[in-house]
Amino acid sequence: MTNNEKVINNKKSTDSSKLFRYQAKFVAGAMNINQIPNFLLPEIAFIGKSNVGKSSLINTICNNKNLAKVSNIPGRTGQINFFNLADKLIIVDLPGYGFANVPISVKEQWEVLISYYLRNSNNLRLVNLLIDSRRGIKENDKKVAELLLKNKRSFQIIFTKFDKVTDCKNLTDEAQNFLTTLHYSCNVMYVSSRSKEGARELKASLAKCIIKPQRSKGR
């Protein structure tokens, strides 16, 4: 039994295999708040530090390596990107945070954009907070988690690049201690875009979002 299977109690979802069998497509990019669309469909968002592997993970779960642009240069995703999956789900790729070599004015613009989206989206069901398995949870990640709770957004923690670490026990302990300080409970998952480990479990958790709304369990 893998760590992810323990997290979701071994529940398999045929809905996820059916949903992610469809081809996702890019439908909009928003560089400012006036460009944020309303598709009237459930949305699930991905957020994390620059170069955490957001685009690669989105490509992995959508089975399309060219869907979200992948770059080794941190800070390349400078807008909110929206992808439509079978007219059933909108996948939202939020700009990365924590990259130092970006002008302060640009950082502030991204912060305004992200904060506005998290505060105002009526369709957002779940946020996936991505953490690099090699780095662990950093101060910027904690601030984002607090922002999510402040806006009453449900989230789950996704440790990316899991193929590059040998043991998840320290990560699990770190995540649980972190969640305890937040007085929040959520899934903690481990995924590798390279080996595909954890991808099926992640898809299952996302597919649930089109069935029923996700409510914050904190505070």
UniProtKB/Swiss-Prot annotation:
PROSITE patterns, A to Z: G_ENGB
Pfam family, one: MMR_HSR1
Keywords, ordered alphabetically: Cell cycle, Cell division, GTP-binding, Magnesium, Metal-binding, Nucleotide-binding, Septation
Organism domain of life: Bacteria
Protein purpose: Necessary for normal cell division and for the maintenance of normal septation.
Binding site for Mg(2+): 55, 77
Family according to the record: Belongs to the TRAFAC class TrmE-Era-EngA-EngB-Septin-like GTPase superfamily. EngB GTPase family.
GO biological process, one term: division septum assembly
Chain positions recorded as GTP binding sites: 48-55, 75-79, 93-96, 160-163, 191-193
Domain EngB-type G: 40-212
Protein name: Probable GTP-binding protein EngB
MF GO annotations: GTP binding; metal ion binding
Cofactor annotation: Mg(2+)
